[in-house]
Amino acid sequence: MYCQMSVSLQPKIYKNEFFKMQMKTRRIAHLMTLLAISTTISAQNVATDSVAQPAKKSKLTLGGYGEAAFSRNFYSDNQYRYPRKDAHKNAPSNGRFDIPHAVIYLGYDFGKGWSMGTEVEFEHTGTGSAIEIATDEDGEYEHEIEKGGEVELEQFWIQKTFRPWANLRIGNLIVPVGLNNSHDEPLEFFTVCRPEGENTILPNIWHDTGFSLWGEVKNWKYEVQMIAGLNALQFSRNKWAHNAAGSAFEFKPANKYGFVLRLDNYSIDGLRLGLSGYYGLAMHNTYPNEMEEKDKINDKVRGNVFIGSIDFTYEKYNWIVRGQADYGTLSDASVISNIKANTPKESPFDKTAVGKAATAIGIEAGYDVFSQIAKMKADNQKLYIFGRYDFYDSYIHDKSQSNNDYTRVRKITFGLNYLPIPQVVLKANFAERLFLGKYNNEPSINIGIAYQGFFL
């Protein structure tokens, strides 16, 4: 396994649009990086997706996190290994080096309750493209992809704080549905790669443009958001809503809106309980919006999306235990599947069928064995031995749809997390996907190192 879901091919990327988007995102990323390096750090915590609490107050905040990973997968990496399982049963192992995420966070407190926050994320070391002149094709200009990956402006918002219980935030926001989207930094999960279940069926990290009202009251924290809705044509069999928050265009269509609610409670010492949900219409939320016109055959197709999630974190007595359960539904799934299958070949939309529902359940527990060794404990070093269990299904189909057992996955993981200092972790784990159908299991070994924190 590598730090990206391997049960499906990557979405299609069309050349002209790809290079336009990549060149623009590179300019944004380079500008943000130079700006971040030239600034001083602060201590104000102005991000929902923060990596740590800064040490002292000042107007500027600079922080981030990053991960490097090695994976060895003892199964086929062929894209047809599920439908043609017998042909790939004895395939050789394969390995990968990767930089799954490298993030720079920059925030500023303008005063009088006004602040801003930005977060730029480089995935898989970023991306690169170039133009070359071919010497053997009459001097033809050629576009070359020199590096696969992504650069994303994951957060950009401006906030007005009225009271601790009333903060208004407008811009590109983290959507805190599920455990991983609200706690995605590498010190907030034990595995080398982000937990697989939620990362399969939900956008991750889910971020979108809209409005947020949030605050804290005693032992409660709440957040309410109105954002651009998901796109039904980007739901898929292997990843359900994972790609549905994205856009292949230079803007995000927002013909329909989504509504988000998250509540967290801290009443019990060492325990955080979270409840989150999303509701919105997903059909007719693309460009151009032609199928919603009066008297057209698909005008009344709505694609209602509901996602509910419950999660918790318990940290006490040298234990850390985390868990989550998610369930999502999509109305008109079979009709939407037919619409997707008949979109133009050149369109950027997935053509696979989409299920009426998807689910993900995960739990992990780790114990700090260095807590029993006085010297290590005094030096603030930690060594967690952990185990994790996941179950997820990205394609719960209705009676009119075909069955695909390989989307129902159980996964077990065992490993170690060593923290020589609080901001750095070395990770190692063994994992195996166990399929409920007659498919080949998928064992893997992963080793990684990560940091998370503010720089001053």
Regions found by a protein language model. Give the residues of each.
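Outer-membrane beta-barrel pore domains
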Residues: 75-77, 88-91, 134, 141-146, ...
